[in-house]
Amino acid sequence: MTKLILALAGASALALAAPVVVAAHEAHGAGMDEAHIRDTAAFMKMHGEQLSAAINHPSRAADKARDPFRHPAETLAFFHVGPHMKVGEYAPGGGWYSRLLGHYLGGEGQLVGLFANPLAATTDPARQQRIRDQAAGFGAEVAGFTGLPAARFSAITLDNLEGHKGTFDRILVIRALHNIMRAGIADTEIRAMRELLKDDGLIGIVQHRAKADAPWSYANGSKGYLKQQDVIDFMRLNGFELVAASEVNANPRDSADHPEGVWEMPPVLSTKREDLKALGESDRMTLLFKKAK
């Protein structure tokens, strides 16, 4: 394994808990090219201070306990998420990243929650409406997290792309790809996201990683884990090319073979296994894709 440590410039290096660590992981067949490494270093010189301020905002006091395992500064730097960008967060869920992104983008950028196409996700009208209601309430929810006006934030469902196509700089899919894989809607959801991206837009994926030799029955999303090469191939089939891969969210201590799936690992600890409590969170791939031409 080769590793490159990019020290944050100036005050950012003091404010963040750890330097940006980017690694190529030959065992998974993908790494960072030198151009992306240089670009990431330049990105941190330009935006590191603003990113640091968002990560260390007092409203994230409770969230920071997960920072050593989720590496938000390193992850957003690797994805080159700038504070001026229009960024879509797919399946925002509990708001851990929304709180950070709200502060980081709320001044000059745009944070848009991206919610599943309700018509594809379920045939139950009540559940469809619930998805639409979640999207409608996203702006107020992030405003509550950040103290910023709700008008600075918005959300859409992926059956409502008109007026939004080709306008997003970045889309983030954080620990969510397995859910749409097992629901059978991954292809249509990813293709909708592709329509939202600008020609030079990028999509960043963080996903629980199965072992390369894991059986399909374990690595099909039902246990929360996916194989890295399967994700790369899936994205290629849906019109994307891999830009770079990072090991910043890797955890070799995770055996990724838990009978009840990734939820046995912290922070969920669904089976309360004592031997898993000290292992950190799951082993994760961190992948960056561009639109294929």
Model segments located where?
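Conserved beta-strand signature within the Rossmann-like core of class I S-adenosyl-L-methionine
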Residues: 200-208
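Class I SAM-dependent methyltransferase Rossmann-like catalytic core
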Residues: 49-78, 82
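Core SAM-dependent methyltransferase catalytic element
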Residues: 255-293
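Conserved class I S-adenosyl-L-methionine
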Residues: 83-93
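A short glycine-rich, Lys/Arg-flanked "PGG" loop and its adjoining helix->strand segment in the class I
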Residues: 102-103, 186-199
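A short, conserved alpha-helix within the catalytic core of class I
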Residues: 158, 179-192
